[in-house]
Structures are given as structure tokens and as C-alpha cells.
């Protein structure tokens, strides 16, 4: 299923609103879990991973009203490591969380281009608008200007172009003539010449609708006798290559893209915990069930079985609780 098509929300959601919800006893449970010596981590998992984000915000308000403390700050002081990072991520409203991830990717020395590419290439125009608004409110600067200050060259251009969210302007009508012309232009900008006209690739990949791009990719393969992905790999490199390939993958199948991100976050030595946490938290109320199905089809194992192999302790238990039962 391509990324711009809607799916039945309940099909995709692993974390749903708790029925018969009352924030006051939940806030009290959390207070008791962190009161005195030691912390009852399982009680924290049971409450926060089984409530929707909206309900968590209500619990935080009740916690403040009853006990005069900020819930997120209290959690930070009681927890540590990857488990703390995951639980704190759950407490952010969705767009503020993604704004924070983008801000963290750019602050300090070095830039985590992969995080920026992942978020900008996979969100809809409305989601990007909300993220930009949250970013400006929380950090007092423009996301677009910060990206321009922190990146350069063609990578900067593709990221700024993605921020406009033009691929989300979808109509069911695709002009076959324009799709063929775009495919010919891509071929002329890469395989046909020595060197590459990167701006032609960026313009077509970032400003055409997703439905249109699918037709372009089909026409391109007929002209070039190779896939658009293979051409991008041979014509570009580094972060620009990663950005272009991400646009193609998200256009073709968003759920497969996230399944791949989760798989490679855990495959091999070490775990990319930031990628694992961000994608499970941010997709849990959107389409994580659908991502789980694609994960199993693509890799022959379930997402939860890989989490069990690759993580441990309270961190593992919280992730498994968010992911829910196997497809």
C-alpha cells in the first residue's frame, strides 16, 4: 500500500485509547511506582504503553494537579538509559516529539542526516506543517532555516524541497504524457550523460505527486532497462543517495520502508536505539500493525521476535508492549 493512500485507522494502530479511562488513578499508580526507594518499572510500562498519547497528556495534567510535580521530569529523574529515552518519548505530543528528533539531529557537532531524511520523506504535507509549527514554538527558530544552516549542497536542496510536502498533492488523474516526459528527463539527467544533473532528479522526485511518480518509475524502467533505485545508486552517493532512495521507497510502500528501518536498526552488531524508539513510538498510533505485517513478509520473522533477541530488561518489555501481538 502506497503511503498517500488512507487505510482503516484501526487496522494500523497498536496503541489504542483505553476504554473507561480515568487519568486520576493512572497518575496515582505512577506516583506510587516512583515514590520512595526503588521504582516499579512494570507499573510504569503497564500504564504508559497502554494509553493513547492524548490520554498520556491527561495523565500528566492529573499528576501535576494531584502531586504538584511534572510527570516527564519525574520520570527522567527515576529512570535511566534506553528505557528512560523510550518512556520520555511516549510523553511528547506527536508533532513535538518529531520536532525534538529533528532538533536533536542538528544540535551540537555533526548532523544525523538519516533522521532528517527519514522524517521529511515519510510525512504528509499536513504532518510536516504541524512539525514545523511545533519546532518554531519549542526552539524559537524556523526548521527550514535550521536545515539550511546545518546542511549544504544538493542534500540541503532536497531536504528543503521535501519540507514543502508537494508529493502529498494527490489526484487520481495522472497525465501519462507528463509521466513519460519526466522519465525521459530523468534518463537524460543521469544514465544518458557523463555526470549527473542532480537538480533534475530533485525537482521531479520532490515536486510530483506520489501517484504520478509511480507511473514515472514504471516508464523509467522501460527506457533505462534498470530501476530508478539502481540508477540513483550508480549516479549519486552518500546522504543525497540516501535521501533520493528514501523518497522512492516511501512513494512505493511506506509500510515496507518503516519495516526496513526497524530491521536494520537491530540487524548486526549493536542496536540503533534512536531509530528503533522513534519509529515504534511515532507509528504506534498510525500504522505499526501494517508495518509488522510487511516486516514478517520481508524478513521471515516477526518484529517482536527480533526485539526479544536484540534488547533486554524493562526496555524490551516496554517495546514489546507497544508493538503488541504478532500478525
Swiss-Prot record:
GO CC aspect terms: collagen-containing extracellular matrix; cytoplasm; cytosol; late endosome membrane; plasma membrane; sarcolemma; vesicle membrane
GO terms for biological process, alphabetical: blood coagulation; endosomal transport; endosome organization
GO MF entries: actin filament binding; calcium ion binding; calcium-dependent phospholipid binding; phosphatidylinositol-3,4,5-trisphosphate binding; phosphatidylinositol-3,4-bisphosphate binding; phosphatidylinositol-4,5-bisphosphate binding; phosphatidylserine binding; phospholipase A2 inhibitor activity
Residues annotated as binding Ca(2+): 266, 268, 270, 310
Keywords: Annexin, Blood coagulation, Calcium, Calcium/phospholipid-binding, Hemostasis, Metal-binding, Repeat
SMART domains (alphabetical): ANX
Annexin repeat ranges per the UniProt record: 21-92, 93-164, 177-249, 253-324
Role of this protein: This protein is an anticoagulant protein that acts as an indirect inhibitor of the thromboplastin-specific complex, which is involved in the blood coagulation cascade.
Written domain comment of the UniProt record: A pair of annexin repeats may form one binding site for calcium and phospholipid.
Family classification: Belongs to the annexin family.
Name of this protein: Annexin A8
Organism: Homo sapiens (Human)
Name of the coding gene: ANXA8
Amino acid at each position: 500500500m502506497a503511503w498517500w493512500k488512507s487505510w482503516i485507522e484501526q487496522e494500523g494502530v497498536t496503541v489504542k485509547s483505553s476504554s473507561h479511562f480515568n487519568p486520576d488513578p493512572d497518575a496515582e499508580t505512577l506516583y506510587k511506582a516512583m515514590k520512595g526507594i526503588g521504582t516499579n518499572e512494570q507499573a510504569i510500562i503497564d500504564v504508559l504503553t497502554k494509553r493513547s498519547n492524548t490520554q498520556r497528556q491527561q495523565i500528566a495534567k492529573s499528576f501535576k494537579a494531584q502531586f504538584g510535580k511534572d510527570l516527564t521530569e519525574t520520570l527522567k529523574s527515576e529512570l535511566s538509559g534506553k528505557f528512560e529515552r523510550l518512556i520520555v518519548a511516549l510523553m511528547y505530543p506527536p508533532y513535538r516529539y518529531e520536532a525534538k528528533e529533528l532538533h536533536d539531529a542538528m544540535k551540537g557537532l555533526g548532523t544525523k542526516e538519516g533522521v532528517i531524511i527519514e522524517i521529511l520523506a515519510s510525512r504528509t504535507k499536513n504532518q510536516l506543517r504541524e512539525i514545523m509549527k511545533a519546532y518554531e514554538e519549542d526552539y524559537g527558530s524556523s526548521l527550514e532555516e535550521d536545515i539550511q544552516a546545518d546542511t549544504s549542497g544538493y542534500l540541503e536542496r532536497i531536504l528543503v524541497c521535501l519540507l514543502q510536502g508537494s508529493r502529498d498533492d494527490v489526484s487520481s488523474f495522472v497525465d501519462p504524457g507528463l509521466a513519460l516526459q519526466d522519465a525521459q528527463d530523468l534518463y537524460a539527467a543521469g544514465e544518458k550523460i557523463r555526470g549527473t544533473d542532480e537538480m533534475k532528479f530533485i525537482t521531479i522526485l520532490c515536486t510530483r505527486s506520489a501517484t504520478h511518480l509511480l507511473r514515472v518509475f514504471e516508464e523509467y524502467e522501460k527506457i533505462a532497462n534498470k530501476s530508478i533505485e539502481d540508477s540513483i545508486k550508480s549516479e549519486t552517493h552518500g546522504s543525497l543517495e540516501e535521501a533520493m532512495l528514501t523518497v522512492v521507497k516511501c512513494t512505493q510502500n511506506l509500510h515496507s520502508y518503516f519495516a526496513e528501518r526497524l530491521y536494520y536498526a537491530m540487524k548486526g552488531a549493536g542496536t540503533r536505539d534512536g531509530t528503533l524508539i522513534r519509529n515504534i513510538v511515532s507509528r504506534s498510533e498510525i500504522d505499526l500493525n501494517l508495518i509488522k505485517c510487511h516486516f514478517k513478509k520481508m524478513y521471515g520473522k516477526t518484529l517482536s521476535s527480533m526485539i526479544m533477541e536484540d534488547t533486554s530488561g524493562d526496555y524490551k518489555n516496554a517495546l514489546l508492549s507497544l508493538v503488541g501481538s504478532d500478525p
